Curated annotation (Swiss-Prot):
Residues 541-596 are annotated as: Disordered. The keyword Nucleotide-binding does not apply. The lineage of its organism: Eukaryota, Metazoa, Ecdysozoa, Nematoda, Chromadorea. GO terms for biological process: nuclear-transcribed mRNA catabolic process, nonsense-mediated decay. The gene is smg-8. Belongs to the SMG8 family. Keywords: Nonsense-mediated mRNA decay. This is Nonsense-mediated mRNA decay factor SMG8.
Length: 871
């Protein structure tokens, strides 16, 4: 019968049992058309107490039954998910289905609250083969309700003569769970089936334990809703075939056994049957483990006192309910805002107990968290759209107001905490830093200026080619084409002669104020004077002790034939090749000391201040900030993008051995290309001048017969390409990589290949695919032009003309053709980035097609008569 009716009638019906110690058992489950949750309890009691199906008038109630034999009080819950309740909600005329279900769920929460504070055991029947997590979540809400109202419950229980739990309940109930179905095959033999039952029960027992702990339903203290037995298993699999019992057979077996022992009278007086059913034994073992502590009389008083839990008296008054509803709506909106914030910041959902207070502000620690990533404007809009779509989906009331708040808070958060710099590097990648003041920003102090960072690196070679360093992607043309090559670690380049290009210098500047330019050296005349100075100092070299590496070079040059023109390059460092002479050293000045003591930041700050100064003087149109172009004739650049340097004498290169101490060349690819140039001069005049040139040359240590039938000279040239990984290679006249096989005669092979085409007159690509095969593939760019000049009365000039796709005009040095001295090894370093009137060229990291062109004829050789005086 209903719990209220049972409480009213129990004192008169069970008058003789009022002092009996009992246990209170709560039953929770679902009714199905073919099986009710009370069926298994009927088997336990061996009588049909609980109906198979609940009527429509008995939904969302508690049925009570006291078993005098077992001394157990059963409280069976008819819940929301019973078929009768679902049918009742569907057929309700006064309320729609959802309103009726919401009311039923509220009533079920009261019923569960009542059971968990008044029972010793809670038996949960699960009709499926898995644990219902939705029901576990519902129990968590019940536990929250119990915690909120425990003081009120404790006050009501003060008048009951029993030592109740201080938390406002009889005790912390033990939970048992029985599964009505399982996935074990019916055709399995009995022994195997029993073994599978035991394994499955054990696994489900562990799962239930973990789930209850996860939802904070078990544990120590007053926060636990229930507890689990530490020594006994709490999960049982019901075997439908063994639920039904043959009561007559059981009684007959008992009477026969006792009759044989002569105790028939005792059997008649105490005819309690022992159970041979697995589920019944399961319940009996668990119930016996706990002592009966409360009498039936006190239990009735307790249940009567707790009826206010069932009738809703615990709930707040309508006025409080209205305020709670408003608070609930605000909390829901706050949760929606929190979820929108999580979608915007791409955070993971917080675990239980860690939910944010509803705000959108990001703390400083969170900005340091890699998961809270700064983002560009495009990424900001994508994340913002995800957040607004979520709000539009879940919010019905005040949607426009909530959307406006989300938009404002997302924009504020992006502007203050998440906005990326988005400045584009010279290679086309954005800066990954949070928006920051950079060099030249006049709105902030100089100390706050910081450099950009694209979080990408590449490998580049110094001007002379002897050393490579890893560099960050440049964000300015000066950083790309100039600053990196002034790195203090490039010691190999410091002692070499370097041509000083003409640079812009306003009238108010002094020579030493410009870090990278000496005005007196910015002309071809200065280069010729330097060459004459080299000739004068070379006389002193004959009387000085040369390094072993140079002595080998001179010896090898004497032993080599003129036809082969084998000029050897030294394996020693540039300092060794120049020891005892300052022929190629740049003149020491206050500028050199200044450069060596300044960092990259100091140079960037200095340049930014110089630009600011010129901007104030309104001279921004007087100079060139890019690479010299035919469209910008008449303007001098602020910094050089080309470098012309001399490694030393031409006999530093030996064609049979190739380049040495030049990193990252492929094996067989370190050889220059011989180029024979025929001269337009009378043969007799040529022979006369050549003899005079060699006779007057103080560096000549021997003479050889001239056997040429026509005037000609041989140069060694190399057009070097380099990719972002630092791979380097030369190309032939077709622009294909020049790599010689192993064990091949390079002298003969190179002559044969050179005869196939004139590399000096060939148009070569500015960019082409690199030889590296490791993905991702890279493109290599023409970076250096190597020229080894002959020892002959000729004038050699170099004047590169470069065409860039999509750019107007032709790029070059911006000066007259650069004259190269005889018997020298020169390297012309080309720009890394091309920027001009048409913009900056960003070709991308890889393109299978060739791009850009270096026009042929950049190196010219003409006859130069020998003058009576020394040249």
């Amino acid at each position: 019968m209903n719990i209220s009716e049972w409480i009213e009638q129990s004192r008169s019906v069970f008058k003789a049992q009022l002092d009996t110690k009992i246990k209170i058992i709560g039953i929770i489950g679902k009714d199905y058309p073919d099986h009710g949750k009370g069926d298994n309890i009927n088997c336990y009691l061996r009588e049909n107490v609980f109906p198979v199906a609940t009527s429509d008038n008995e939904t969302c109630t508690i049925f009570a039954h006291f078993s005098e034999d077992e001394q157990l009080l059963f409280l069976v819950l008819n819940g929301v998910d019973d078929v009768a309740n679902l049918r009742k909600c569907m057929e309700s005329e006064s309320k729609n289905y959802f309103e009726a279900m919401a009311e039923s769920e509220s009533q079920q929460m009261r019923l569960l609250h009542f059971l968990f504070i008044s029972c010793h055991f809670i038996v949960i029947f699960e009709q499926t083969s898995r644990i219902d997590l939705e029901f576990i979540r519902f129990l968590k809400k019940v536990n929250t309700l119990r915690s909120l109202n425990r003081r009120k419950v404790s006050q009501r229980l003060r008048d009951v003569d029993f030592d109740f739990d201080s938390d406002g309940r009889l005790t912390v109930p033990y939970v048992l769970m029985a599964f009505q179905r399982n996935n074990i095959r019916t055709d399995t033999n009995i022994t195997k089936k029993r073994e599978l039952y035991e394994k499955l029960e054990k696994n489900l027992d562990h799962q239930l334990t973990d789930i209850l702990k996860l939802y904070d339903l078990t544990g120590s203290g007053n926060s636990a809703l229930c507890q689990l037995s530490e020594s006994l298993q709490v999960v049982h699999l019901l075997n439908p075939d063994s639920v039904k019992r043959d009561i007559i057979t059981e009684m007959f077996d008992i009477f026969m056994a006792e009759a044989e022992n002569g105790n028939v009278a005792r059997v008649a007086a105490n005819h309690k049957l022992t159970s041979n059913n697995a589920f019944v034994r399961f319940l009996e073992d668990r119930f016996r483990a706990e002592k009966n502590e409360i009498s039936l009389n006190i239990a009735i008083d307790m249940l009567e006192a707790l009826q206010f839990v069932l009738d809703g008296s615990l709930e707040e008054k309508p006025e409080s309910l209205r305020s709670q509803t408003q608070t609930f709506i605000k909390r829901i909106q706050s949760d929606h805002m929190e979820e929108a914030r999580r979608l915007y910041t791409n955070e993971t959902r917080p675990v239980s107990g860690e939910r944010r207070g509803g705000g959108f502000r990001i703390t400083e620690q969170e900005t340091m968290d890699p998961s809270v990533k700064i983002r560009s404007k495009q990424e900001h809009l994508i994340r913002f759209n995800e957040a607004t779509c979520y709000i539009e989906t879940v919010v019905g009331i005040n949607q426009q107001e909530i959307l406006s708040q989300v938009q404002t808070q997302c924009n504020d958060m992006w502007q203050s905490d998440l906005r990326a710099c988005e400045s584009i590097s010279m290679m086309g990648h954005p800066c990954v830093k949070k928006v920051h003041p950079t060099y030249g920003d006049q709105t902030v102090p100089e100390a706050r200026w910081t450099a950009h960072d694209a979080s990408n690196t590449l490998v580049s070679t110094c001007v002379c080619g002897n050393k490579q360093l890893v560099r960050q992607e440049p964000f300015t043309l000066k950083e790309a084409n100039f600053d990196f090559y002034e790195h203090p670690d490039f010691n190999c380049c410091k002692g070499l002669w370097r041509y000083q290009f003409q640079l812009y210098q306003e009238d108010t500047e002094e020579k030493d104020d410009i870090m990278w330019a000496d005005r007196e050296s910015n002309s071809l005349r200065a280069a010729k004077k330097m060459a004459q100075r080299e000739d004068e100092l070379a006389v002193e070299l004959d009387d000085m002790e040369l390094p072993e590496s140079l002595q080998q070079s001179y010896t090898s040059s004497e032993d080599s034939s003129e036809d082969d023109d084998d000029f050897a390059i030294q394996t020693a460092s540039s300092e060794d090749s120049l020891s005892g002479s300052d022929s190629y050293a740049r003149p020491g000045s206050r500028r050199d000391e200044f450069e060596s003591s300044k960092t990259a930041r100091d140079m960037a700050v200095y340049f930014a201040k110089r630009i600011q100064k010129l901007e104030k003087l309104e001279k921004m149109d007087d100079f060139l900030m890019g690479v010299p172009n035919t469209l910008t004739i008449g303007k001098l650049p602020m910094f050089p993008s080309f470098f012309l340097t001399s490694l030393g004498e031409s006999n530093l290169y030996k064609h049979g051995a190739g380049l040495k101490n030049q990193p990252n060349f492929k094996l067989g690819g370190e050889y220059l290309t011989p180029a024979v140039v025929f001269l337009d001069v009378d043969l007799d005049v040529w022979c006369r001048d050549l003899v005079k040139f060699r006779t007057d040359d103080y560096t000549r240590r021997g003479t050889k017969d001239l056997k040429d039938d026509m005037p000609r000279v041989k140069l060694f040239v190399g057009f070097e390409y380099e990719c972002s990984r630092g791979h380097r290679f030369f190309v032939d006249h077709n622009g294909e990589p020049l790599i010689y096989p192993r064990n091949v005669n390079v002298l003969k092979e190179s002559s044969a290949r050179a005869s196939l085409g004139n590399i000096l007159n060939a148009d070569l690509p500015l960019r082409r695919p690199c030889t590296c095969r490791k993905p991702p593939l890279k493109s290599a760019q023409l970076q250096k032009i190597h020229v080894v000049t002959p020892k002959a009365p000729v004038k050699i000039t170099i004047d590169p003309k470069i065409l860039v796709p999509g750019h107007e005009g032709t790029y070059g040095t911006g000066q007259e053709p650069l004259e190269l001295h005889h018997s020298k090894y020169y390297i012309l370093h080309l720009p890394v980035v091309y920027s001009g009137p048409s913009g900056t060229w960003m070709p991308g990291e890889y393109n299978s097609e060739r791009m850009g062109t270096l026009k042929g004829g950049s190196i010219k050789v003409v006859y130069k008569p020998v003058m009576p005086f020394r040249w």
